[in-house]
C-alpha cells in the first residue's frame, strides 16, 4: 500500500498528513516535520537550531533527562528531535500497544521542555567537546571550508554544528524563542505509518496538535549563489590531502528535466566504481582510494559537489584532473555505454528504494514537500527509460556553470 496525503483541520488550519497503513508491523512511526525551520534559521547564531533540537532530547523540566529517558526505555519508546537545513523534526517510534503513552509523553515534552540552565550547559559542553574533536578531522574541516567558500553570504555558509565561539554565545532565551516560533501548526507536516487506520492516527495525535499554537506561515526562500573558479588550501600535519569541490547547478527542485540531472550525476560521480571520476582518478591513475561527485537537489538550493583523498604529493595533479574531467563531461557528454549502464542500475535498483515503510514514507514526504505529484517517481523512471543520448548530452552541455569549481583543500 502506498502513502496517502490527507489533511486534518486543527484550529482552522489544514495540516497535511502523509500516511501509510502497514498491518504486518505493530508499530507507530510518527514524525512532526516543521518547514523552513532547520539551520537555515541560525542567522547570526550558528549552531542555534542544533542546540534547540538537542535540548528537546533532554526530557521535560519536571522529570529531567535521566528519568524521562528511563520511562522511554521501560516502554520501548523513542522520542528524538533533529534538524536538517530546511526542516526541524520530532520523531516518535513505539510498539502499537504503547502508542498512546508515547504520544502522551511527547505532549508532556512539548508543554514543558527542559528549559533549564543546567540542561543548556550540558548540551553546550557536549557540543563543544564534539567540535574540539573535529579540529583534527580533516574531512570535516575541508567540507566546512567548502561550504564557507561556495555559499558565502548565505544561510549555508556556516556549519549546522556551529563553532566553539558561536555556541558559547547562545543563551536559553534564544532557544526558547526559536522553538516557540518553530513549533506551530502553520508550518507542520505530519508523516505517519504503521498498523493504524487513517482515522486511528488522527485520533491518536489530535491531543498534541490541539496544544500547538497556530503560528505564522513561514515561506521557504531560494538561496541564490554563483560559484567561481577558486581554491583555498589549509596547511595541516596530515598524511593525505583532503580535496572537496563544488559548483552551482542551476535547476529548480520542481524542474521537469531533473531526471536528466539524476542520470548525469550518476554517470559523472555518483555510481562509485564505473563513474567517470572513479574510473579516471582511481582505476586508471591510482590517485585516490575513492572519488565521488553528486548533484544535490533541494527546495532552497541545488549544487554539484564531490570529494577525494590523495597523497600530498599528488594533490595538485588530482585537483587539475577533476577540473579537466568536469570540463570534458560538459563539452563531450556521455557515451551510449555509460547511459545504458546508468539506466540499468537506476531502473533495476528502484524496488530496493521502496522496501521499508520508512523509505516509502520518506519518499512520499520528499515529493509532497517539493510540490511534486505522488506518481512523480514512476513517471521519472519512464522518462529515464526513454532518455536518448543526444537529449542527455544537450542537457549536460547547457549547464556550463558546473565548470566553475571551487576547491577546498587540507594538506601538508
What residue spans do the PLM features occupy?
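N- or domain-start disorder-to-order transition segments that initiate the globular core
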Residues: 1-28
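His/Glu-based metal-binding/catalytic segments typifying zinc-dependent metallopeptidases
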Residues: 22-38, 45-46, 217-274
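M16 family metallopeptidases and their MPP-like homologs
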Residues: 20, 25-54, 65-111, 141-165, ...
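Short, conserved secondary-structure transition motifs
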Residues: 94, 129-134, 224-236, 345-353
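Short, polar/flexible loop-turn hinges at active-site or ligand-entry regions and domain interfaces
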Residues: 111-118
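Low-complexity, intrinsically disordered Gly/Pro/Thr-rich segments
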Residues: 388-398
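An aromatic/glycine/proline-enriched structural segment found at the starts
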Residues: 6, 152-161, 165, 185-252
Amino acid at each position: 500500500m502506498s502513502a496517502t496525503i490527507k489533511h486534518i483541520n486543527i484550529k482552522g488550519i489544514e495540516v497535511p498528513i502523509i500516511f501509510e497503513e502497514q498491518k504486518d508491523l505493530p508499530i507507530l512511526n510518527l514524525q512532526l516535520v516543521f518547514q523552513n525551520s532547520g539551520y537555515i534559521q541560525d542567522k547570526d547564531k550558528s549552531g542555534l537550531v542544533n542546540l534547540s533540537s538537542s535540548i528537546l532530547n533532554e526530557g521535560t523540566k519536571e522529570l529531567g533527562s535521566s528519568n524521562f529517558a528511563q520511562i522511554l526505555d521501560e516502554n520501548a519508546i523513542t522520542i528524538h528531535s533533529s534538524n536538517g537545513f530546511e526542516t526541524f523534526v520530532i520523531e516518535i517510534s513505539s510498539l502499537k500497544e504503547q502508542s498512546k503513552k508515547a504520544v502522551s509523553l511527547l505532549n508532556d515534552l512539548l508543554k514543558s521542555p527542559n528549559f533549564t540552565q543546567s540542561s543548556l550547559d550540558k548540551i553546550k559542553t557536549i557540543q563543544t567537546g564534539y567540535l574540539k574533536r573535529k579540529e583534527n578531522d580533516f574531512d570535516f574541516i575541508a567540507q566546512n571550508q567548502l561550504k564557507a567558500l561556495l555559499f558565502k553570504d548565505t544561510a549555508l555558509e556556516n556549519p549546522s554544528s556551529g563553532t566553539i565561539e558561536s555556541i558559547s554565545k547562545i543563551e536559553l532565551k534564544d532557544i526558547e524563542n526559536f522553538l516557540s516560533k518553530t513549533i506551530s501548526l502553520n508550518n507542520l507536516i505530519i508523516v505517519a505509518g504503521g498498523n493504524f487506520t487513517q482515522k486511528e492516527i488522527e485520533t491518536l495525535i489530535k491531543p498534541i496538535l490541539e496544544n500547538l499554537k497556530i503560528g505564522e506561515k513561514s515561506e521557504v526562500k531560494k538561496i541564490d549563489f554563483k560559484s567561481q573558479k577558486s581554491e583555498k588550501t589549509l596547511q595541516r600535519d596530515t598524511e593525505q590531502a583532503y580535496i572537496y569541490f563544488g559548483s552551482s547547478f542551476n535547476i529548480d527542485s520542481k524542474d521537469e528535466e531533473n531526471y536528466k540531472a539524476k542520470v548525469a550525476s550518476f554517470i559523472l560521480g555518483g555510481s562509485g566504481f564505473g563513474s567517470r571520476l572513479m574510473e579516471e582518478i582511481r582505476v586508471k591513475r591510482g590517485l585516490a582510494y575513492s572519488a565521488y561527485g553528486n548533484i544535490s537537489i533541494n527546495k532552497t538550493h541545488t549544487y554539484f559537489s564531490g570529494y577525494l583523498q590523495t597523497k600530498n604529493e599528488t594533490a595538485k595533479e588530482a585537483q587539475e584532473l577533476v577540473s579537466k574531467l568536469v570540463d570534458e563531461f560538459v563539452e563531450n557528454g556521455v557515451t551510449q555505454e555509460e547511459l545504458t549502464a546508468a539506466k540499468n542500475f537506476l531502473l533495476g535498483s528502484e524496488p530496493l528504494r521502496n522496501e521499508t515503510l520508512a523509505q516509502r514514507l520518506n519518499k512520499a514526504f520528499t515529493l509532497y514537500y517539493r510540490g511534486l505529484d505522488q506518481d512523480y517517481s514512476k513517471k521519472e523512471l519512464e522518462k529515464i527509460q526513454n532518455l536518448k543520448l543526444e537529449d542527455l548530452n544537450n542537457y549536460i552541455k547547457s549547464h556550463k556553470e558546473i565548470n566553475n569549481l571551487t576547491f577546498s583543500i587540507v594538506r601538508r
